[in-house]
Amino acid sequence: EDYNSIKEYYQMRRPETADSNILDLYIWLNCYPTWYFTNDKGLMWVAKSEDGQYYSSIPCCKDEDLKECFLETQKYFNEVLQKKLVMYVVDKAAVDLLQLPEDEYVVVPDRTYADYVYDAEKLRTFSGKKYHKKKNHLNAFKREYEGRYEFKFLSKKDEPEILDFLEDWKKHKSDTEEHEFIDSEAVGIKYILEHEEVFDYKIGAVYVDNKLEAFTIGNYESREDMVYIPVEKANPEIRGLYPYICSQFLIEAFPEAGKENREDDMGLEGLRKSKLSYNPIYMVEKYTIIQK
């Protein structure tokens, strides 16, 4: 119900972070208790982690109002919550705009949440030496499953199949914490599927032998000429399926897009290795701000 009003605030500033993507917000909104407040300049976030720590993220407002909205967030933390301000995933442009005094704040880069940005055309074609291995895996998939695979777009009506796939996909993960993470993600995916008429996104899927084996969700922001990919899942036992859905989704859904943001690696070694293997053209740095 708040989507349209929140979307207006999200359009005021467009840093290239996944966190500035409203689709990403709604997929992960149920992870922790989260609320917001507004004034005539912007929207300010407050969230509470499992261990009871309060934190915020960069306000949604125009550049010229950022300092005012930042201080409004700090005031809420100090006066209402009786806490020092902690703000995560702050983009570099915001840090530069805020010009925070060193004697009052600690500002530190956080590699864990840096986003990976790619040349979209390279991901469509996997051309060049750097993508030789990806191209080999992709071709192996096409050879192995020739005549047996199909790319499709999915929608709300496919929700049961998508949720069943996520349950199966979870079996490949042994970590209990990761299971909770996947369950939370599934709740968010269910929400955007059930409200597809208000969200602007596309879901691509790959079927092998008429069975759903991979799906991905993405949306496009014209101001950055950027596709954002908050979700991509594939059966890890099918060689070349991940490169195939990555490439084919861009070809079918966003053929003209210049860049793709594939989000952060959450500090997970395996995920970092995977994201680096797609050869990002740059990283979107993010910072943590802590009030002293």
Regions found by a protein language model. Give the residues of each.
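Short catalytic-loop micro-motif centered on adjacent basic/acidic residues
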Residues: 86-87, 150-152, 259-262
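Acyltransferase donor/substrate-recognition loop-hinge adjacent to the catalytic core
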Residues: 102-176
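Generic N-terminal amphipathic/basic segments
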Residues: 1-28
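Short, conserved active-site entrance elements at the starts or edges of catalytic domains
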Residues: 157, 161-211
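Conserved catalytic-core motifs of GNAT/GCN5-like acyltransferases
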Residues: 108-116, 281-292
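Conserved donor-binding loop and adjoining core beta-sheet/short helix segment
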Residues: 18-93, 98, 207-238
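Aromatic (often tryptophan-rich) hydrophobic motifs at membrane interfaces
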Residues: 200-290
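Conserved active-site alpha-helix within GNAT-family acetyltransferase domains
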Residues: 94-108, 136, 267-283
